[in-house]
Amino acid sequence: MIGKVAGTAAIAGISFLAGKYSNDDLPIFRNVQSATNVPMNQIQVSEPMTVKPASLNADAMGPSRSAEIMKHGYPGFTNVRTYEDFVLSYDYKTRTAHWVCEHLTPERLKHAEGVDRKLCEFKPDITFPQKFLSQNTDYKCSGFDRGHLAAAGNHRKSQLAVDQTFYLSNMSPQVGRGFNRDKWNDLEMHCRRVAKKMINSYIITGPLYLPKLEGDGKKYIKYQVIGDNNVAVPTHFFKVALFEVTPGKFELESYILPNAVIEDTVEISKFHVPLDAVERSAGLEIFARLDPKSIVKENGAKKGGLLW
């Protein structure tokens, strides 16, 4: 865990999210004080054995980029898959990912000649057990989009790279108009614009299932499921972006958005939250290997002196 986000921007973002769009009286937003952690240098972490999807020619992927993509730490180690351009942890219960991590550079964000999104097909990753897979039929007539976690627009360096973003393991049910096709897309494009100016960018994205205070005064976690395979519909989504501005110096942005229609007039900065709020909500440690002192700006607020 890197630590709490300071500054009025983060506080305002939490208030907006909790008040207008989020579930009521969430403890993660009322108390975001960091728990005591064991220093990372006292923990020995082994990288998980990752599997290359068998439904595409694994040899075409070349050497694994997992060490490069996951340089700043794995948020978890459950059912990890390494694709050409991103790493994913899959949740058998919800039929969606726990998290997806992307590593972007200006070079890797270039749109290679001949790469065509229209050639991509939504399909299950058959390296996971059949009984835990979602299918296209689960989404049909559900009222939800097959929403990308690792954005297809980030991975146009090769046809294989963009094809792999269409695995259903990288999808989660998202409200279409007003969210997936609008505000969520705005956030993806924002991260891509910033990443084109940075040395390296690391983006971790995932679903959330947050509690809501109901009329009886008790809090419940409730979410819809769709299709014969009971694919879970998240109540919210998170995205954490780590941008390397200069060698060894980073800017961090953390967001939680409701899986709901969001007005066009609302700025994405309104959904800034402390990183600690994301971690508590998701049950994940994000960028745990990163030295907190290397973060020079969080959610737009400078910390620890000037970078320039």
Curated annotation (Swiss-Prot):
Its EC number is 3.1.30.-. Disruption phenotype: RNAi-mediated knockdown results in accumulation of apoptotic DNA in 1.5-fold stage embryos and delayed appearance of embryonic cell corpses during development. Mg(2+) binds at N180. SMART domains: Endonuclease_NS (SM00892), NUC (SM00477). Keywords: Apoptosis, Disulfide bond, Endonuclease, Hydrolase, Magnesium, Metal-binding, Mitochondrion, Nuclease, Transit peptide. The active site is at H148 (proton acceptor). Its cofactor is Mg(2+). CDD domains: NUC. One of its GO terms (molecular function) is DNA endonuclease activity. Its main location: mitochondrion. It is found in: Mitochondrion. GO terms for biological process: apoptotic DNA fragmentation; DNA catabolic process; RNA catabolic process. It is an enzyme of class 3 (hydrolase). Gene3D superfamilies: Extracellular Endonuclease, subunit A. The keyword Transit peptide applies. The active site contains 1 hydrated magnesium ion that has only 1 direct interaction with the protein; all other interactions are via water molecules. Homodimer; disulfide-linked. Interacts with crn-5, crn-4, crn-1 and cyn-13. Belongs to the DNA/RNA non-specific endonuclease family. Endonuclease important for programmed cell death; it mediates apoptotic DNA fragmentation. This is Endonuclease G, mitochondrial. It comes from Caenorhabditis elegans. The gene is cps-6.
